[in-house]
Amino acid sequence: MPKALKFEYKNWENKIAVRTVKPIKIWYGKTEWHSENQWFLKALDLDKNEERDFSIRDILEFL
């Protein structure tokens, strides 16, 4: 299983939070929240216990 990552992330509402995730894959496309094609990190959000798609350009800093 991949190692957990921790990073600061700015969501579509411009709110910044620290996220701890287990990566699943990197993919290119768009989502409901990001209407332009871009790179995403699909990961298991360990705090919410849900799979999420994180826009790579909105990852501010790895911790």
What are these regions (language model features)?
Residues 1-63:
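Short glycine- and basic-residue-enriched patches
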